[in-house]
Amino acid sequence: MKDSEKISHTRVDSKNYKNPLCCRKIIEISSRSNRSVKELKSLLTGRGIKRHGKTLVSGKKIVSELIRFNPDIILGWISSAGSVFLPSPVLLDIPCYKVTKELFRELDIHGTGYPLLVVKVPECVPYQENKISDNVILMIAFQDPLNVGAVIRSAAAFAVTSIVLLKEAASPFHPKSIRAAGTTVFAAKFMEGPSINEVRSIDRSIIALSPQGIDINSFSFPERFVLLPGVEGPGLPPGLHPDFMVSIPMEPNVESLNASVATSIVLYEWYRLKR
C-alpha cells in the first residue's frame, strides 16, 4: 500500500440505482506527499500526461458524455472527502480516489465541484504524409492548450480529420485543451509531427496565415493542402516558405485575431466552398 493511502470497499445504496448492490473500491488519500497525488497532479501538465499516458477530465457535461460513450478509457475517478457519490453506475467497479477538499480543488482547476475522471490517453502515431489519404492536413504548433482544444473542435466541425501535432504544440489532452475541445478530442486521430522549422510537404500546397496574404474571400483553395497557422505571437519561422499566404479582412483598429479563431475561420471558409 502506498504511503498515506487507505483502501476500503463500500456498498452502493440501491435506492440510487436499479442495478444490484455492488462493492466499490475507494482509495482514500490525505497526504500531499502521497505518490498517487503526485501522479494525479502531474496530469495537469503536458509532460505528466505524456509520461503516464493519462489525463484528467472535469465538468459535468464532458464527464457524463465520456461515461456514456467512452467508458472503456476510464481508469478511475476522483471525489472530494465528504462528498463521494457516483456520477453513474458505470463507475461502480472503477477505483475512486477520495482526496481532501484542498487537494480536490487543486486538481479541479476549472472549479466544477463535480467528480473528475482519470482517463487513458490515445496513442499518437508518427506523421507520414504519404500514408494520409485526406486532401487536407491541419498542422498545430499552438503552445496554449486552450487554442489547441479550440482548433481541434473546429477541425471536427468542419470535417478535417488529419491533425498533426508539431513538436511545439501543447498537449491536446491537457485539461484546458479538453475543456475547450470537449469530447471531440477523444474521437480525433492525432499524428506526431516534426518541429515547425522542419515542415515540408510532398504533394500538398502549404497554406499559412498572414495579414499581408491574399484576402480569403478571393482565395481559391487547392484540392490538397496543409494548413499551417504557426505559433501564437512569432507566427512562422523565417526559413519556412509556404506556397500561399491568406489573410482575413477585419476592421483596421483591430491588430489581429486569436490564433485558433483565425484558423477556424479559414477551416470554415474551405468547408463552405467545398460543400
Predicted feature residues:
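Amphipathic alpha-helical repeat scaffolds
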Residues: 59, 143-151, 257-262
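Short, charged/polar "capping" segments at the starts of alpha-helices
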Residues: 82-88, 172-174
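Glycine/small-residue-rich loop that forms an oxyanion/phosphate-binding "nest" at active or ligand-binding sites
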Residues: 96-118
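Structured adenosyl-cofactor binding patch, chiefly the S-adenosyl-L-methionine
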Residues: 115-119, 156-158, 169-186, 238-275
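RNA substrate-binding interface of SAM-dependent RNA methyltransferases
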Residues: 122-213
